[in-house]
Each structure stands twice: as C-alpha cells, then as structure tokens.
Amino acid sequence: MILSKPILLSAVQPSGNLTIGNYIGTMRHWSKMQNNYECLYCIADLHALTIQKNKIHLNKSILDTISFYLSCGVDPQKSIIFIQSHVYQHSQLNWILNCFSQFSELLRMTQFKIKSNCSKKINAALFNYPILMAADILLYQTNFVPVGQDQKQHVELTRNIAHRFNSLYGHVFTLPKPLITQHGSKIMSLLEPSKKMSKSDINKKNVIFLLDDIKTVISKIQNAYTDSETPSKIYYDIEKKPGISNLLEILSAITNKDIDILLKELEGMLYSEFKNIVADHLSKFLYKLQKSYNDYRNDEVYLKKIAYEGAMKSQLKSNKTLTKVYDKLGLIPLF
C-alpha cells in the first residue's frame, strides 16, 4: 500500500519584484518540499488586487512569479503551479466561508490593523483577505501551509472557520497546520532591522530585490546597519544585535551553513570584512538565480502552458471539495 503524501499549499502575491526576504522565508524551501509533500504553488493574483490595479504591471508580475517558481526548482511534473484567478472555485468558496466567519475575528487580524493604521483608503477586500486565504487553503484539503510568523494568525483563523463548518455539517475540511522554519522565516530591513523587509518599503536601500544588479546588492549590504560597538563583535542576538543577526540570517540561508559554524569562521573580523563576505556570497547567489530566472522569463509560451496545465489540475482537485460543500449546504451544482 502506497501512502499518499501530505498536501502543502504555498502562495505568493505577484505584486512586484520579490525580495531576498521572500526567498529565504519561503522560496528556498520550495524544491525540497516536493520530496516530502504533494505541493501546490499558487500565484495569488486575486489577493494582489487589494493593493494593485495596474493591468500591465499585474500581467507582467504574474509571469515573473511563475518564472521565480521554476528558477527556484519547482518541477511542474512533480508539483502544480497555478494562477489563483484561473480556478474559479477559490472565489466561490470565499463567499461561502464569509458566511461562516465572524466580523470580530477579522477585526483581530494584526496585519489588517497595521495596514489600516497606515492608510485611510482601505478597501473591503483587504479586510476580507484572510477569508480568501482560508478558501485557498481549504479547497485542497491542505495539511501544511509554509508561512512566516506574520501569517500564522491567518492559518489559525482558517482552522477556526474549518472547525466551525465541520461542527455543523460533519467532516468536510482538513484542518491545516502552519509550517514555520526556526531561522530565516523573517528577514528584516537592512537599515531598520526592527521592522520586516518589505518590497513595498519606500526606501529601497532597506531591501534586497532578487533582480537587483550586483553593484546595487554590494552597495546595499555595505551600507546595512550594524552597530557602533568597538571593537567589532559578531554574534547572534536579535535584541542586542539586530543588524548583525539579520546579516547572519541572510548569510546562513544562502550558504546553507548553520549560524554557529559561521560565527567560528567570522570570529575576530571587522564589521566591514563581515559585510564584504555577505555581499560576495549574496552576489554570486543572485547571479545564478537571475540567469535561471531570465531563461524561463524569456519563454512566455512555456510559462502560459505551465499556468494552463496547473489550472486544469487545480480545478479538478478543488471541485471535489466545493461539491462536498454544495451538498452539505443544499446548493445545486452546475453538473
């Protein structure tokens, strides 16, 4: 008897150039995940509409994101890569789950609080964002969702909604679990290491973009915040050494070395020497990634073929869950 692999869903918004934080937090794990999980990789273009309405930019970003999936080792023969809006079941289940969600639950979502405090022009979709995320997850009977600490609350909300529905109608949804790595799941801003690195940061010197040219990467690392301790002391302590710790996280991820091993190699170095090492390794890493990315990105016919095949497979899987939901609620399916 062949045991089926647990199901894993990972989604990325096509809302602009991805960062080294995106890579270290999620993307670097994509290739290995295929060995242990049945993986679905989603380009969350509907989520992107909460903040982006530019047609040309969104269209380009969707194909960019598929290229990043492929360049990071996702194999379309092993996994499913699909565009969220191609699978209509996401929107259908989204509305149904809204009917089983509490207004007070959504008000407690930390990410919404942060974003609503930053702008008065908040649309309703941003408020309901976690419900669509729940639909994304529950449609595929997902067992695990790789997320950062900032998204963990959304997975917990998804579990609550699923449990609420199951309590009323019997077992329909699998309760998903967040998959969080110990190190590197949250890369911080280069100049302000007290806040998370974000591709939407106004100050681009805070962010390493995956498509930054090499000179820019070196400059950003060399100007990254460390501290004024004399003589230089390189050790890992997020509270006392946020800048140093952040650079150690980056170096550890791209070299595949434990931080403890790196600290022995870096012992006695000046901060400037440490930064040069980080910049050198990061530049070489990004050069290889960018070459692979560009090879895929230059073949849009292939990218659209991948998206089409992924949509067909995703619709078959998601429709099984949606049919169960319709049956439990007394809705009449089209077929």
UniProtKB/Swiss-Prot annotation:
PROSITE patterns: AA_TRNA_LIGASE_I. A motif ('HIGH' region) lies at residues 14-22. It is found in: Cytoplasm. L-tryptophan binds at D136. Its EC number is 6.1.1.2. It holds the Pfam family tRNA-synt_1b. GO terms for biological process: tryptophanyl-tRNA aminoacylation. A motif ('KMSKS' region) lies at residues 196-200. InterPro entries: aa-tRNA-synth_I_CS (IPR001412), aa-tRNA-synth_Ic (IPR002305), Rossmann-like_a/b/a_fold (IPR014729), Trp-tRNA-ligase (IPR002306), Trp-tRNA-ligase_bac-type (IPR024109), Trp-tRNA_synthetase (IPR050203). ATP binds at Q13, P14, S15, G21, N22, G148, Q149, D150, I187, K196, M197, S198, K199, S200. Disulfide bonds: none annotated. Gene3D superfamilies: HUPs, Tyrosyl-Transfer RNA Synthetase. GO terms for cellular component: cytosol. GO terms for molecular function: ATP binding; tryptophan-tRNA ligase activity. Its main location: cytoplasm. It is an enzyme of class 6 (ligase). Keywords: Aminoacyl-tRNA synthetase, ATP-binding, Cytoplasm, Ligase, Nucleotide-binding, Protein biosynthesis. It catalyses: tRNA(Trp) + L-tryptophan + ATP = L-tryptophyl-tRNA(Trp) + AMP + diphosphate + H(+). HAMAP family: Trp_tRNA_synth_B. PANTHER family: TRYPTOPHAN--TRNA LIGASE, MITOCHONDRIAL. Belongs to the class-I aminoacyl-tRNA synthetase family. Catalyzes the attachment of tryptophan to tRNA(Trp). Homodimer. This is Tryptophan--tRNA ligase. It comes from Buchnera aphidicola subsp. Acyrthosiphon pisum (strain APS).
